[in-house]
């Protein structure tokens, strides 16, 4: 974001890369979303035997490619590793050995029957079983992140308490570090929690339970906002797996309700309300942190940004609800199908989870997967510690791997490819710097590498913005039943893959272009 703002201020080649990426991302989205030349997420199922299957896919989204370029190969590789563990390792093992894949179990049909055959079996196994490994890993990884962040968090809280006595105009604190008074933030949180407690009391009919759940909501919202912000820094706010954080909040709310012996039909709605609040908090935390980090890089005043963030939150609260209701009405909502033809897989998943917790069986189906994910997270934490102790430049942070397991496998592939393009650009500059040391070529390769990296980030940002803007337009056309489909009678998925790979080449070329210019200059001397 900061690079985009700098490019807009300076103009020239920087803004050109941004515009190019935006135009290409927009064109790609129009061809995909409006004319439907190819699927957004082409997938395939591979049979490894009579029982075992695995799923492969490639999500055709330029935005994910841009995310990979921005986060770099180390993080992109770990996200891809998570996808491989979930889909190439986890699903084949589960379909081979689990008894509920081909036989009815847990009071319902088999996973094979739910999938309607082997073609969709990997997706069903992942959504109902394997992704909970990612949830368990996120739980441990999120708690570990908070442990690692305990000193900065404590320092920030203490600084906030000190600022409560000084105010935003205190000249002892540098302008670029002045936040809103902690007293104002704390009072705002309390004032917002009070009406939520009344809402919970209306649902539960138990004032003590309502107050407790409101406190749990604030505490869990604070913790998972930090986790959500951390994950947004890994894969971007648009692709941050907030639903995983929301599931954790849902489980925490369910446990708190069970402590008050809340059962029956009132438990799930109350838990869903808590999860909804935490979901919003975790979602906007990533955006807010990105805004504040961009402001820090540009020299903005934090308390002014924070004030405008609050204004934006209030405005969004009034704007989002009618927009969502309009989309639901346009999807043919009825009393029997409240969401119409909207699939809403995450919402259905959370509704199923909340009902399961308050049922007689509880989480007996998902618990083993969650424990496996927690164990995997511990292994990754220990491995990361040993690698750092050995002085290795590489590490195994939990969150990227957990995100890779939780997201569809096709999502991790373009992120990895984008990270690979960025790494190839960096590798080219390392080789050219070595040539400079050997006296083969001359030039300021450090400045060239910095310029190339900045251009690649701007190009990637353009891909993300272009796809997002045209995605909104396409969604509006689809909601209005505007006929945008195009059917030429054959599949076009490979065309979409080829075009996306061309974007990969462009991302690499944009990164190495300053270096190529230096090489041409050397040849001319």
Model feature map: region roles:
Residues 1-525:
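Alpha-helical multipass membrane-protein architecture
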